[in-house]
């Protein structure tokens, strides 16, 4: 076992050929530059890029794998220059029946082991999102429905920045996550706290007692990568090992 650093929430601003992905993110924030920044400047061992369901980004990933600097792992993830494991993710905005019956919106980060999985996920989600090429567009499904689609393609779902007043579960949808996910709540084994909260706040909520807390950068530019990150204890860097750490299985865990 050894300790690694993981930032599981990094956006893409533009595709390699300049097509917009996250409008509010920097143009320099593309797939290849994120991998390079983590490997050469930030010392991040595992990075979750959460705009990989965009067909433009999928094309970039396919080209990235042809460079010879990266390859897919059997246990999930893409290894770049034997230094960084890239997790292929998608941030999805769900439509929830919020407090007092009003409609609310919440963000979820979903991760998949292999490129084929997120390609299939992207294809299915294109029926629920008007513009699948852009980042975090609102879907017409709830978190309760989304988790089934994510699992269908071997993925995991983490409710994102759960306390943020704008577009989060506790922020504008519900007082209890269990009210959203119902009998599927046990399938949620980790939550992202977000930049506006910490473990002291989260520890006050009883339904989060057995959930793993993660904190990430939500980077919209290269310098913002790793402004917040997680320290994990794992056997190696892969999708499978990250899932074990999030579940606190077999000695894998989030240390800080």
Predicted regions and their residues:
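An N-terminally biased module of ancient metal coordination in phosphate/nucleic-acid-related enzymes
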Residues: 1-102
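Flexible inter-domain linker/hinge segments
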Residues: 237-256
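Extended substrate/RNA-proximal surfaces in nucleic-acid metabolism proteins
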Residues: 58-189
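Active-site beta-loop-alpha junctions enriched in small/polar residues
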Residues: 11-13, 52, 89-95, 113, ...
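Short acidic/histidine-rich active-site segments
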Residues: 211-227
């Amino acid at each position: 076992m050894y300790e690694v650093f993981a930032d599981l929430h990094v956006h893409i601003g533009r595709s390699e050929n300049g097509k917009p992905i996250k409008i509010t993110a920097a143009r320099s924030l593309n797939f290849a530059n994120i991998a390079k920044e983590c490997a050469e400047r930030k010392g991040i061992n595992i990075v979750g890029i959460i705009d990989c369901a965009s067909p433009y980004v999928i094309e970039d990933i396919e080209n990235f794998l042809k460079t010879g600097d990266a390859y897919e792992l059997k246990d999930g993830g893409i290894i770049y220059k034997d230094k960084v494991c890239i997790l292929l993710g998608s941030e999805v905005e769900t439509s929830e029946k919020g407090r007092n019956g009003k409609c609310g919106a919440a963000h979820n980060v979903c991760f998949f082991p292999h490129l084929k999985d997120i390609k299939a996920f992207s294809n299915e989600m294109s029926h629920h999102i008007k513009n699948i090429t852009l980042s975090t567009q609102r879907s017409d499904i709830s978190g309760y429905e989304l988790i089934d689609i994510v699992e269908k393609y071997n993925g995991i779902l983490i409710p994102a920045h759960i306390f943020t007043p704008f577009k989060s579960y506790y922020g504008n949808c519900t007082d209890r996550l269990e009210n959203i996910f119902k009998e599927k709540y046990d399938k949620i084994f980790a939550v992202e706290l977000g930049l506006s909260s910490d473990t002291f706040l989260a520890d006050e909520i009883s339904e989060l007692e057995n959930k793993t807390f993660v904190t990430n950068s939500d980077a919209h530019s290269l310098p913002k990568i790793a402004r917040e990150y997680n320290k994990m204890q794992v056997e190696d860097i892969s999708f499978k090992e990250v899932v074990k750490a999030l579940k606190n299985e077999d000695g894998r865990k989030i240390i800080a």
